[in-house]
Regions:
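Phosphate-group recognition and catalysis centered on beta-loop-alpha active-site segments
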Residues: 1-243
């Protein structure tokens, strides 16, 4: 059996992707509650801004009806379906005893996220992970992060300068983590980013036979739709989950 490599985090994070979309309608309070009930130590979602500046959790950023499609950014909060939760509602309903990873989907949404979390759940800030596909878009958040983690969410094939140069750049620019598809990761690549104190996160891990080897690589976080499978693998490799 592969020897387990060390993680940067004392307790790697098990993120329920969109709340654990295999178990309940994605990005709903029902899904987020269930993901935590099934043992996830983190929740994942996408965050958009309504036209009146409210951060809401939804994947596509589009509200569909029988005859139309409207962008969330063109609608006020009170025009959205009730099943689309606001960030504040997530915190009100689920508390703050978990990690929260958010893909930032709208201009300036990161600053509003930090404002809302600071207002309604400041104890969540050290466990808040803010993700962008262009790491440069995270730079305006550095002076406002209040302990939140900034995450370069990309693919290995897009890192044209090579992973070592990217790791060095992220470290020098104050970015905390990199999030790659699980097929991009190897034990050596995890170790490389750890040398620069960059956390290594993996996504799209739907089966135990994929989860267990990547946890042994020393990965710092995993994302899965199937929370039960993820937690079975986590306990088998790392023991009881903790924050």
């Amino acid at each position: 059996m592969q020897q387990r490599l060390p993680s940067l985090l004392e307790h790697p994070v098990a993120f329920a992707h969109r709340g654990g979309k295999a178990h309940a309608p994605e990005n709903t309070i029902e899904a987020f509650r269930l993901g935590l009930k099934l043992g996830a130590t983190g929740l994942e979602s996408d965050v958009w801004l309504t036209s009146d500046g409210v951060p809401v959790l939804e994947h596509d950023g589009v509200v569909r009806s029988r005859f139309s499609r409207r962008a969330i950014g063109d609608l006020r909060r009170n025009q959205l379906p009730s099943f689309i939760p606001t960030l504040a509602e997530l915190i009100d309903e689920c508390g703050t005893s978990y990690h929260l990873s958010l893909d930032l989907k709208a201009p300036n949404v990161g600053l509003r996220v930090l404002d809302v979390v600071g207002e309604v759940g400041p104890e969540l800030l050290p466990r808040l992970w803010l993700c962008e596909p262009l790491w440069q878009d995270l730079l305006p958040l550095r002076d406002h992060a209040e302990g939140a983690k900034l995450v370069d969410s990309t693919r290995l094939s897009r890192i044209k300068e090579g992973p070592e140069r990217r790791a060095a750049t992220l470290a020098s620019e104050g970015i905390d983590a990199i999030n790659l598809h699980h097929t991009d990761w190897s034990g050596g690549l995890v170790t490389l980013f750890h040398r620069f104190d960059i956390c290594a996160i993996a996504w799209d891990l739907q089966f135990e036979h994929l989860l267990r080897p990547i946890l042994r690589m020393g990965i710092d976080g995993v994302h899965s739709d199937w929370v039960d499978r993820m937690m079975d693998a986590y306990r088998a490799e790392l023991g009881a989950p903790q924050l």
